[in-house]
UniProtKB/Swiss-Prot annotation:
Role of this protein: Protease subunit of a proteasome-like degradation complex believed to be a general protein degrading machinery.
Origin superkingdom: Bacteria
Protein name, UniProt field: ATP-dependent protease subunit HslV
Gene it is expressed from: hslV
Keyword Aminoacyl-tRNA synthetase appears in the UniProt entry: no
Reported regulation of activity: Allosterically activated by HslU binding.
Organism of origin: Borreliella burgdorferi (strain ATCC 35210 / DSM 4680 / CIP 102532 / B31)
One Pfam family here: Proteasome
Subcellular location(s) per record: Cytoplasm
Length: 182
């Protein structure tokens, strides 16, 4: 799956987790909006989520993801279990299967990529990125992560700025959300 029109990155560093995205929305070769918000706080700010792809599909998936977490009913938040459950439904459900988006979700301990092909990926490094500029942002973030002085916020911001310079579907109107790690 390849989605043009965005870059989303998740980073965990020095006790903080950040999810950030650019604001560009494109339709074909036209920029429709430059300040869209593609990240959300879920469960009263305990989980961060970002998406690449169709906005309405992503909102549906955010809602389904929250339902999966709440379905446990024990008050514990297990984003890994919820991600696997969502990926299974997304792949097998006739309606969900048609949704075109990818998601990054993060809590204070985990960063995950969830796709409609049934993939749930926990990155080897504390960095993962999706969207048309994802590879550029990911590469930049890996390099910036080596700088001990940079925070997760700064790594995400700088990495997305690099992606915006290289990817025509990514801009530098960046929105970042951050949570403290436990």
């Amino acid at each position: 799956m390849s989605f043009k029109g965005t870059t989303v990155i998740a980073i965990k560093k020095n006790g903080k987790t950040v999810v950030a995205a650019d604001g560009q929305v494109t339709f074909g070769h036209t920029v429709l909006k430059s300040n869209a918000i593609k990240i959300r706080k879920l469960l009263n700010g305990k989980i961060l989520a970002g998406f690449a792809g169709s906005t309405s599909d992503a909102i549906t998936l955010f809602e389904k993801f929250e339902e999966k977490i709440k379905a446990k009913g024990d008050g514990l938040i297990d984003i890994k279990r919820a991600a696997v459950d969502l990926a299974k439904d997304w792949r097998s459900d006739k309606i969900l299967h048609k949704l075109e988006a990818m998601m990054l979700v993060a809590d204070s301990n985990n960063i995950l990529l969830i796709s409609g092909t049934g993939d749930v990926v926990e990155p080897e490094e504390d960095v993962i990125s999706i969207g048309s500029g994802g590879n550029y942002a990911y590469s930049a973030a890996l390099a910036y992560m080596e700088n001990k002085k940079l925070s997760a916020f700064e790594v995400a911001l700088r990495s997305l700025k690099i992606a915006a310079r290289v990817c025509i579907y990514t801009n530098s109107n960046i929105v970042l959300e951050e949570i403290e790690n436990e």
